[in-house]
């Protein structure tokens, strides 16, 4: 307002004033002068003054422009100076951030909207705006700082936590001595259980994880020297990935050693047999006694057969009788043995067959308790099958004859 009034006073005393309207500038349509009222010609002289540029006129608010364009409204009947408008918005020439186009002023994107009462107060709204912006920035900065502080413990990357990583420290000497003593006492099995780890954790005032890590490192670094001082091989008392092949070979050797003992255990009942031919496993089993008296009667053994496991060759332990038995017993035995899938059909040993119970070979309960001198070896099973088959073939030959 002050700038506009100074411009008006400068235009009145200007020697370049002319009473004709519409002169000076062709940017705005200038109103015509009033010849009946020569005192009002200063308005047109002000508008036609060359001191007013287009930019200055462009910065004039619409309310001031309307008051200048209508002298009757500006001066009244007595052409008195116009009263300063109380609610007139601030001229645009005082705000450098605004454009040069005429029209209503638009607020900046970071500027709060002005009320009409704030127009004449000067830069006070801007100060409040700056204070408000500082508060917003401070609040956002505090929030980001809080978020950053919350993210710091969760960041496990080496680049982010390198500056705040703690320096590596050693365990207390008392705790290390307790762990060393336990390791030396259990050097042949240096693998503490969960209860022992908890006890050591209480004694050393360390966490269970620290105790576990210490033993992992001690078994790799300290334990081999302890075992070598005792003259022991460390690979036999530690479980490591490097010694996995050695442990596998030792386990294979132990398994092979167990297998080597199995034939000896199987051969022991063969030598304790009191009757039967030569127990040589590599030869075909075809016992042929030289005389009828050489066949000794073995104790009675009940017939039990595992049909599901051995379907083709059912083994049975049966009673062997002498040659001088009656023929009616032989015919009863011939009726019982009808299986033709038995092996060793070429054996023609003259031996009496064995008698069986009612249901034959299928897990029948024993009619009498077995004797103490039973022989369940595999060799005797084969001998019994051969003798049984030979007796069956002999009976068939007699019946056909």
Swiss-Prot record:
GO molecular function, one term: DNA binding
GO CC aspect terms: nucleus
DNA-binding region: 164-226
SMART domains to which the protein is assigned, alphabetical: HOX (SM00389)
Gene3D superfamilies the UniProt entry points to: Homeodomain-like
Swiss-Prot/TrEMBL keywords: DNA-binding, Homeobox, Nucleus, Repressor, Transcription, Transcription regulation
PANTHER family associated with the record: HOMEOBOX PROTEIN TRANSCRIPTION FACTORS
Family: Belongs to the TALE/TGIF homeobox family.
Name of this protein: Homeobox protein TGIF1
Species this chain originates from: Pan troglodytes (Chimpanzee)
